[in-house]
Structure formats: C-alpha cells, structure tokens
Amino acid sequence: MSFQFSLTIMLYFQMVIMAGTVMLAYYFEYTDTFTVNVQGFFCYDSSYTKPYPGPDESSDIPPVLLLSLVTGVPVLVIIVGETVVFCLQVATRDFENQEKTLLTGDCCYINPLVRRTVRFLGIYTFGLFATDIFVNAGQVVTGNLAPHFLTVCKPNYTALGCRQFTQFITDANACTGIPDLVIKARRTFPSKDAALSVYAALYLAMYITSTIKAKGTRLAKPVLCLGLMCLAFLTGINRVAEYRNHWSDVIAGFLIGISIAVFLVVCVVNNFKGRRTEHEHWPTENLAQMPIISIPRVENPLEKNHLTAFAEVT
C-alpha cells in the first residue's frame, strides 16, 4: 500500500468521523431523539422560583451573538495568523521552520499555509461540535432544573397534595405551563454558553501564545489572552445573573470546555507546532554535537571462567 493511498484513506476516514460528529450534534440539538430525564422537585422549593428571564433571544448575550463570536473570531484570527507567519517565513527565508508541501492522495499538492490553516480550523470545529455533544448529553441525562423552573412549570400544588415543603413531587405531568418552556427549563446542567465560550477563548488563547513569536509582545499576548478568557467568564456570570443557570451549571460548563480545548491543543495539534518529516527529527549535522554516553562494561562470570580455563591450557 503506497503512502499516497494511505493518506487518501485517512482523509476519507476523518471526513466520516467529522460528518458523524456533526450529525450527532444535530440530533441532540434539533430533534427529540434523546428524551430528557424528568427530575422531581420539592414543593415550594425556593431554588427554582426565580422569575422567568424570557427567551434566550432577549438575553444580554443572545445565542446568535455567542455563536457568531465562537465561530467567526477564531476563524479570522487563525487565517490572519497563519498568513502572517507564512509570509514572514518566506520573507526571511526561514525554510527550516516551514512545513513542506506534501502530496495528498494521487494528484493534490497542499501548500503549507493551506494545510496548517485547514488543520487548526478543522480541529477547532471538531472540538466545537464535541463540546456541544458533551453539554447536550449531560443536559439530557441529568435533567437538572433551571432557577426559574417552577415559574414556567406552574404546578397545581393543591392537586399534587403539597402540604409540606419537604414533599417531593415525581409526577411527570405535574407541570401545567407551556411544554416547550418546561423542557427548556429541564436542560441546564451543564451550561452550554459557558462551555462553548470558554472552549473558544482557551483554544484561541493557546493558539496566540504558541504561534506569535514577534518581539515586543511580552505584554500584548497575555493581555489579549486574558481578555478572551474574561469574556468567557462574563458569559457564565451573565447566565447566573439572569437566572438561566445555577453556579454549578456554569462551573461544569467551564470544566468541559477547558478539558476539550486543552486535550485537542496538547495531544492533537501538538501546541500548534509544525510537522517535520522523519529525516528532520535527527539532523545529521547535530549528531556530532550530541553528548557521548559511555556505558560501563559488565563482566560475564561465564566468560571470565572461560578465559581463565583457556589461559591454564595454554
């Protein structure tokens, strides 16, 4: 099997994985394939009686704005960053650190600029859908209630026989409110907005830190990266302030987004470092500069006895 044929097979395999990830995220997000777990509640529980904040579109950070930022900003920054790095390498003739043009499949030569850009954006997109899947799976399995759940649920406490605050209601038909709002209020753990925002911010911050090597950016890079993380933190704070999520929901979303971003950057794209061919791992000119390690010789008792016997015979 030729090397080009192996690359073609791997390319198709990765496309199948990406398509499957997108389809799974679609089924979680826009279909009723996965039923939300119906979690019970205590009568008159003050943890779930916060006022209804309105639809997500009325939030200070609506879904359209959030999705536009987590998709548009990383794409723009990575494209501009890779273009600048490539142009600087060509201008300074820094061909050692520049990736080579490779043959993919049977006919296609991919430029290093295009290859790095597609690789980093592809991994980012995969992580974005993976974060969405993790969050939706957690929401479906737990069915955790929003702070305004009882406000939209509108349970009939008299019919349910609520005479004590400690009485636990497990009836799936206890709510008399709008079904769509009730289902939405059952899907809060973990917070999707917190997970997506911190994933995008951390991935972009690690890209900026690992890629930008220009002089005079000793303070610019930390300020820019911390600014991105601050925006993600404010997104989580906004979810709690508007009574759309609990603190535990936001913290869990942060942990999911951070974990996926760190895993992809460290283990998959190798901290955004360029790939090198096999003969570049150990340059010939550097072999002479390598320290020589002398390993002590361990005598074999059998060999020693053999030499002694041979000396006696002679």
UniProtKB/Swiss-Prot annotation:
Keywords: Cell membrane, Membrane, Transmembrane, Transmembrane helix. It comes from the Eukaryota. It is a multi-pass membrane protein. InterPro entries: P_Acid_Pase_2/haloperoxi_sf, P_Acid_Pase_2/haloperoxidase, PA_PP_rel. The chain crosses the membrane at residues 5-25, 61-81, 120-140, 194-214, 223-243, 250-270. One of its GO terms (biological process) is positive regulation of neuron projection development. It is found in: Cell membrane. One of its GO terms (molecular function) is phosphatidate phosphatase activity. GO terms for cellular component: plasma membrane. The keyword Chloroplast does not apply. CDD domains: PAP2_wunen. Induces filopodia formation and promotes neurite growth. Belongs to the PA-phosphatase related phosphoesterase family. This is Phospholipid phosphatase-related protein type 5. It comes from Xenopus laevis (African clawed frog). The gene is plppr5.
